[in-house]
Amino acid sequence: MDQPTILVVDDIPENVELLEAYLVPEKYHVVTAYNGIEALEQAKETPPDIVLLDVMMPQMDGFEVCQTLKNDPKTQFVPVVMVTALKERDDKLRGIEAGADDFLTKPIDRVELLTRIRSLIRVKFLHDDLEKSYVELQE
């Protein structure tokens, strides 16, 4: 299995560095973006296996980024984990409506982060295998 690619998106460099410090030792390939527009460009350039997405960002917030990713056929099945300091129920509902697959509340618990990532990547890889098999059957 290839090294899974994780797109980490946060406008605060220290938050990005913290997530990288958790992920790189676990053998994940980390790609970073510091705003929503950059995140969408990175997702096109280097298709991720999962996106860790901050909610509160300038220019384009995480809800908009998530919705854009989920509306794009090339990224619609990429799991998106909203990473947020927001704890309101309405914010979580808005994230679900935008297509988020999971939520993590700041401050991030390292063990919880890694467990959720492993679970979502496993599902993503199963989906990719199923899609590949379907295409092969169609040929």
List PLM regions with ranges:
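A Lys-centered signature of the CheY-like receiver
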Residues: 58, 106
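Active-site beta3 strand of CheY-like receiver
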Residues: 46-55
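Two-component/phosphorelay signaling modules centered on CheY-like receiver
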Residues: 4, 13-37, 45
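Amphipathic alpha-helical coiled-coil "transmission" helices that mediate dimerization
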Residues: 120, 125-139
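Receiver (REC) domain active-site loop signature in two-component systems and cognate sites
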Residues: 57, 80
